[in-house]
């Protein structure tokens, strides 16, 4: 049970807030997506336009989720597209928390950025307020948008994505919350402890939540984290790749979840316990190798192999490469200009095709346009917002090398253009 709420503190009038949200969102999105969806683009000289494109796409993807939940209208306004053969219960029970948790995890690094001047600063302040209000709505039993954290297994996944986002933006999203909202949110996250995760990447979801508890200064279960860390160590297949459970699968779950979650958990708990200190250097070396592999998966035109499940996560397949860029931890073979250009090419191929968004700006199922047959039974509209994780490099300042270095062809584009490059090298011994 959540604690009984009282009136939220220090929250402006709802009608005035909604008016500011709508007007601000319209102005931010006015430029719309770049034209020429699906074209192969030649790298351009570095300019403010590179970052502006990423910001524009982040606003287009994330603004509807945050603005509607902040004002208690997410359930009323977000459609829930799901396969006819959806799993054991309606996806509408889960889809809204999916959308929120994944959106916050993608936007969090940018929201934590401390650059007090300029147009981005004003947008960041507005979005921080949106997330604060959304967290209040999501955990308030009196809200029409009180989200499901405790019924079924799926909420464990997206509570973990929300915890991940709060870890990446603790100063801007968690610390300023009123004590009442913090208490409700902690109770909601604790309610996921009743879910028994399957023996695969799901072990990282309760581990991420327990890590957040540790960082938030409340009681946490070290054994839950240890189980996830030890299991993935046992499932390591070599050359930077983990099994999703004991067996290997051709899919993008090393990027969707495994590498970014495992690295974040170990980074955040470093200094709180030395239990896994010896593992972190190995985990980081593997993460570097997998980032190099991901960069090589980007085709000359920004496409990538449509392998495995959850392809409707679109450019979220490159969460790990984006996360390594945000961490300033790209491998030596991948320059910031390569990573920025390659990720932007993937974004264009997966977010710009006709049919990607509905008339009201909500994502639709597909990889390149509207392709509902690609959806597994667990996919619904909220699931699709995992694509937002590609925006994590926006957490780097505008003056960082990632944004200022010259644009560069990524590996496949160079090789298929005839460039003479050294061979790829496997990671051995880790």
Where are the model-predicted features located?
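Aromatic-lined, polymer-binding surfaces characteristic
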Residues: 107-109, 124-284, 296-319
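An acidic intrinsically disordered interaction segment
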Residues: 49-76, 119-133, 171-179, 214-233, ...
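Long, repeat-rich segments with strong aromatic
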Residues: 248-363, 375-398
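N-terminal secretory signal peptides
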Residues: 1-16, 23, 29, 39
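Low-complexity, Ser/Thr/Pro/Gly-enriched N-terminal "stalk/linker" regions
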Residues: 23-27, 39-98, 105, 109, ...
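CBM-like carbohydrate-recognition segments
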Residues: 67-80, 84, 88, 139, ...
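C-terminal segment of classical bacterial N-terminal signal peptides
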Residues: 31-34
């Amino acid at each position: 049970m959540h604690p009984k709420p009282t009136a939220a503190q220090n929250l402006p009038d709802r009608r005035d807030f909604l008016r500011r949200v709508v007007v601000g969102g319209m102005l931010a999105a006015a430029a719309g997506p770049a034209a020429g969806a699906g074209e192969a683009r030649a790298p351009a000289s570095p300019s403010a336009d590179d970052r502006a494109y990423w910001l524009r796409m982040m606003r287009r993807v994330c603004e509807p989720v945050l603005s509607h939940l902040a004002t208690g209208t997410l359930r009323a306004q977000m459609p829930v597209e799901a396969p006819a053969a959806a799993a054991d219960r309606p996806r509408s029970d889960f889809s809204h928390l999916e959308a929120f948790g994944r959106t916050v995890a993608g936007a969090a690094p940018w929201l934590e950025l401390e650059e007090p001047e300029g147009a981005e600063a004003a947008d960041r302040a507005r979005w921080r307020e949106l997330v604060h209000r959304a967290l209040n709505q999501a955990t308030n039993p009196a809200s029409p948008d009180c989200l499901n954290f405790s019924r079924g297994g799926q909420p464990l996944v997206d509570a973990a994505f929300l915890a991940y986002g709060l870890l990446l933006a603790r100063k801007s999203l968690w610390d300023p919350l009123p004590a009442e909202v913090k208490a409700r949110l902690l109770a909601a996250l604790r309610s996921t402890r009743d879910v028994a995760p399957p023996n695969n990447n799901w072990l990282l979801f309760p581990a991420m939540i327990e890590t957040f508890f540790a960082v938030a200064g409340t009681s946490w279960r070290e054994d839950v984290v240890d189980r996830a860390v030890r299991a993935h160590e046992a499932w390591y297949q070599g050359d930077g790749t983990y099994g999703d459970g004991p067996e290997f699968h051709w899919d993008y779950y090393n990027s969707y979840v495994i590498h970014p979650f495992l690295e974040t958990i170990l980074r955040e708990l470093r200094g709180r316990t030395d239990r896994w200190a010896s593992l972190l250097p190995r985990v980081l070396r593997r993460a570097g190798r997998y980032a190099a592999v991901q960069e090589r998966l980007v085709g000359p035109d920004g496409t990538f192999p449509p392998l495995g499940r959850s392809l409707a996560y679109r450019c979220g397949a490159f969460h790990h490469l984006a996360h390594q860029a945000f961490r300033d931890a790209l491998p030596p073979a991948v320059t910031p200009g390569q990573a920025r250009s390659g990720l932007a090419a993937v974004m264009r191929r997966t977010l710009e095709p006709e049919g990607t968004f509905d008339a009201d700006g909500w994502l639709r199922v597909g990889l390149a346009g509207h392709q509902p047959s690609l959806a597994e039974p667990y996919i619904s509209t909220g699931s699709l917002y995992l694509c937002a994780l590609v925006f994590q490099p926006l957490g780097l300042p505008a003056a960082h090398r990632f944004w200022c270095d010259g644009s560069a062809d990524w590996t496949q584009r160079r090789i298929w253009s005839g460039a003479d490059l050294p061979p790829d090298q496997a990671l051995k011994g880790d």
